[in-house]
Amino acid sequence: MITSRTVSSLEKIFHDSEPTCASLSEMSMLGNERASFQLAYFSDEDTQCGISVSGWKPENIKIYKVVEINSDLPAFEDSDFYFLRKTPGLYPDMLEPVEDNSFFAESGHHGSLWIELDASGESAGRHDIFITVSKGKETVTNVITVDVINAKLPEQELMCTMWFHCDCLATYYKVDVFSEEHWNIIENYVRNAANHGVNFILTPLFTPPLDTEVGGERPTVQLVDVKKTKDGYEFGFDKLDRWIDMCRRCGIKYFEMSHLFTQWGAEHAPKIVAEVDGEKKRIFGWETDADSEEYRDFLHRFAAALTACLLYTSDAADE
C-alpha cells in the first residue's frame, strides 16, 4: 500500500517520522513565476512507483525525488532552539531528477517528491493539477489547485548571490577543469541558478580561498592566466571574458570577484598559479603573508590590469 498527500515546499519530510504538517490544497503564482510543492508519500514495501502530473503543460513541470543526506553535525552545542532536529543523521536535502516518470519508494520510509511548476505560457485562472502515484494496479491521486494571477513578477531588484564553486562541479562530474565539458556543466548550473533568482555570481579570478582547511587546497579553478616575467607579471583574461559572456547569456547581471585574501582573518594570499620559466607553479598561497611586499606588488599590478579588462568588457557590452 502507498499513501500520499500534497504539502508545502517549506516542509521537511524525514524518512523515520510521519509528517504532521497540514496538507496543501491551493496555491497561487504570477504569470512568469516558478513555484514548488511536495508530494509526501509512504510505502509499506520496497517498490518502484510511477508518477504523473496532469493539468499543466508537461514542458513546464519538473519532478525531483527529495534525497536525504548524512549530517554529522547538524547544529553546534550552543545553537538556539529553532531547529527541527539537532542529532546526527539523515536530512532531506538533495533534489534528484525523476527519470522516466518513475521513482523507488523504500519500505516503511516516509519520503517526498518535489514538483516545480513554471507558469510561463499557462493561461491565467485556476488550474486543477492532478498528481497520480501508481504501484502496479494500485493508484493514488492528489489534486492541488493553482491560481495563475494575470500579472507578472517585475524584474528582481535585489542583488542575490550564492557562492558558486565550479571546482566542485569538476570533481563531482570527473571532468578536467575548464574543459569544454566543464564549461557546459558550469553553464547549465549558472542558468538554473539564474532561473531561480540568483543574479550575482562568484567569479573565480583565482581559486576561491573559501571553506578550505588551513594549509589545504581546493582544486585549482583560476580564470586569470598569470605569467611571471623578469619585469613583473603578464595577465591573460580570455577565460574571464568567456565566463562573463556565458553568465550574461544565462541571465546573470552582477559579478562577485573571488577573495584576494584567505577566509577567517585575511592573513594569507589565496592560491595563485602562474607560468614560471615555461612551467605552471603556485606562486602564492598559505605561505604568503597577506601584507608581504611581494604580494602587495602583485595586487597593485593585477588590479590595474583587471580594471582595464573590466572597463573594456563593460564598454563592449554597452555597444
Question: Which role fits each region the language model picked out?
Answer:
Residues 1-25, 29, 44-45, 138-177:
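Long, low-complexity ectodomains and other extracytoplasmic segments of secretory-pathway proteins
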Residues 102-156:
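Extended acidic/polar, glycine-enriched regions
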